[in-house]
Amino acid sequence: MTIALGRIPKEENDLFDTMDDWLRRDRFVFVGWSGLLLFPCAYFALGGWFTGTTFVTSWYTHGLASSYLEGCNFLTAAVSTPANSLAHSLLLLWGPEAQGDFTRWCQLGGLWTFVALHGAFALIGFMLRQFELARSVQLRPYNAISFSGPIAVFVSVFLIYPLGQSGWFFAPSFGVAAIFRFILFFQGFHNWTLNPFHMMGVAGVLGAALLCAIHGATVENTLFEDGDGANTFRAFNPTQAEETYSMVTANRFWSQIFGVAFSNKRWLHFFMLFVPVTGLWMSAIGVVGLALNLRAYDFVSQEIRAAEDPEFETFYTKNILLNEGIRAWMAAQDQPHENLIFPEEVLPRGNAL
């Protein structure tokens, strides 16, 4: 006797199956369920940034010109943060601040919250896209896991840090020179370069660059001879079945150079993944600490001795004085509403910095 086993038939026009079939269809640009989050959010974030840098002034929030329309260029244009008085308002277009007036919304800095929030969800959507595609083609999800590093940095710097401070005002504005100014702010007010989490972040990013350069050069150096062409690129054949380069030769080379070398490709590539992602996560954790105003290293004994002994000075004490100068200049400029007035004798003078 034969028993036929099968699925219970579903309705012909099941909405979920119809959407799933369309979203995950094989096409030139994969959409997927993650695309429902990624594409609209990325479109709005980029569109908001291009609109802001082209047309919108920062006169009402920072007293600055920040658009191409006002004479800025690509390096100096920015979408600026809202004023400090607006604290952590989401600045919705229909909210009590703008009351549906688009021009007023732009003047208040509404484009910054618009770009920041849509940008954060776009990055999350991109990570989900990598998860979804990896599952579809039966890959491990390490690409998506690695992308959590940039997401952690973005969220910590643009969202968590200002949430810990008095308002969105203290987040970075979206522009090149604006980010540079934010870096100087971080140094002056938080002594960020002496923060151990920043040190781990720098080690991770620069270490990853070094590993990437070494790995790429080593692979190119140990390509198997598989033709009689005159250049390196003769081996770029998508149908090649055999191994591209000699791990044994590479291992012998670096063993002679350093005395130690990777002998396992899996460990080598995991290490190349681990170094930058860990560095980015450490940086993100450090920025969360700054949101709570946690201090970096303080070498108080050196500061006390430098204050008592005019002949004693270290690079650390010089940097502390430099930070004081940054604070004295930036606080009065960035926060005019606080009416901060410093006597002339405490302000740094020109090249004396």
UniProtKB/Swiss-Prot annotation:
Catalytic activity: 2 a plastoquinone + 4 hnu + 2 H2O = 2 a plastoquinol + O2
GO cellular component, one term: photosystem II
Positions contributing to Fe cation binding: 215, 269
Binding, pheophytin a: 130, 143
Binding site for chlorophyll a PD2: 198
Other comments on record: 2 of the reaction center chlorophylls (ChlD1 and ChlD2) are entirely coordinated by water.
Name of the molecule in the record: Photosystem II D2 protein
UniProt source species: Secale cereale
Gene: psbD
